[in-house]
Amino acid sequence: MSNIQLIVGLGNPGLEYKYTRHNAGTWLVENLARMHNCTLSLQSKFFGYTGRVTIGGQDIRLLIPTTYMNKSGQAVAALAGFYRIPPESILVAYDELDLPPGIAKFKLGGSSSQNGIRDIVSSLGNNKDFYRLRVGIGHPGHKGKVSGYVLGKAPAKEQEQMDAAIDEGVRCIEILIKDDMKKAMNRLHSFKAE
């Protein structure tokens, strides 16, 4: 059984970003909240939308920061600090360029080139020991095209693949919390949306 106490979905605030690839983490937390009939409410002291769900008898807080992606650490540190949630009890969902659409993977710790993750690491005192759920969005093929790509909307087929991977990610979060990381990883890492 995992000791996850906080699940964070990264993205950018505002309608202009709502359906962009960069908001894949936000979509995942919104789906998780919907699945548990949880209404997320704006909490200015936590710089984001928050909610609470119970999964496998565990009380879990949900957070979608209202800061821009590169300032996500402000929200995570505020909520984790207030509730005394250690980094190893945090799971952050975010978009991953290095995975194709339709794939999602868990990861524990380590570095990342993703700006939101880097800011969270910095805001947690350079502690990298939190869980990640990386939602594949694919790569545009050239480094110079990344910004426009992540801030763009995916074609319908890719969006369907990302949505399927997010749905599977939500199911695997339940397995992670009720059982363990190995079982959740085995299932999620063998999933590929067609």
UniProtKB/Swiss-Prot annotation:
It catalyses: an N-acyl-L-alpha-aminoacyl-tRNA + H2O = an N-acyl-L-amino acid + a tRNA + H(+). Monomer. Hydrolyzes ribosome-free peptidyl-tRNAs (with 1 or more amino acids incorporated), which drop off the ribosome during protein synthesis, or as a result of ribosome stalling. It is found in: Cytoplasm. The record marks 12 as: Discriminates between blocked and unblocked aminoacyl-tRNA. CDD domains: PTH (cd00462). This is Peptidyl-tRNA hydrolase. The active site is at residue 22. The lineage of its organism: Bacteria, Pseudomonadati, Pseudomonadota, Gammaproteobacteria, Alteromonadales. Its main location: cytoplasm. SUPFAM superfamilies: Peptidyl-tRNA hydrolase-like. It comes from the Bacteria. InterPro entries: Pept_tRNA_hydro (IPR001328), Pept_tRNA_hydro_CS (IPR018171), Pept_tRNA_hydro_sf (IPR036416). One of its GO terms (cellular component) is cytoplasm. Gene3D superfamilies: Peptidyl-tRNA hydrolase. TRNA binds at residues 17, 68, 70, 115. Keywords: Cytoplasm, Hydrolase, RNA-binding, tRNA-binding.
